[in-house]
């Protein structure tokens, strides 16, 4: 048997909600999680989740990692990583088969300080290169429940996006029809990304990780064009005239 035909490793992008905790009261955490899950059951059911303890540890609020992991699993969430934990928390997480995530993005690299020995050396002018984004992806067919679409640029959809479908783009998203599924724009952290839709009835909309669920979108006008964008770390939904 050709050994190369058995398996292969391929690069890919994996998305998981990040659960940032500000309170270490497990009862309150469970209550709030139940509310969140009830507001978007299709999105959160059997969803992977990475939990971030950095805010708790910065404020000297300790939490029982084993109890937290048990709580998440009981609510049908699957912990896939711990971030911001202290050494003992990370050790316990690893013992429970939850890996440690460093939380450092490609933009967070720490560069060593460089001392220039000769202060008379001429300053090197930076070379400015314009970022080139891939052409927009266009979808003309309906996006059905269970389908997932990812665009490394802008995403333009001319047909309906059904409930249970998920569309994601590193740039802007345009849906020239009804959206009933989930839409995530700026998935690589582009806070300037926007979302445009002719009829917003979504289960969830997100820009750069900031999201609103269907529960938050109840007051959004139906069958009217809207745009969604970020302002001061909050999603703004604005009707287009």
Swiss-Prot record:
It comes from the Bacteria. The keyword Transmembrane helix does not apply. Cell division inhibitor that blocks the formation of polar Z ring septums. Rapidly oscillates between the poles of the cell to destabilize FtsZ filaments that have formed before they mature into polar Z rings. Prevents FtsZ polymerization. This is Probable septum site-determining protein MinC. One of its GO terms (biological process) is cell morphogenesis. The keyword Cell division applies. InterPro entries: CAP/MinC_C, MinC, MinC_C_sf, MinC_N, Septum_form_inhib_MinC_C. It comes from Nitrosomonas europaea (strain ATCC 19718 / CIP 103999 / KCTC 2705 / NBRC 14298). Interacts with MinD and FtsZ. Belongs to the MinC family. Keywords: Cell cycle, Cell division, Septation. Signal peptide: none annotated.
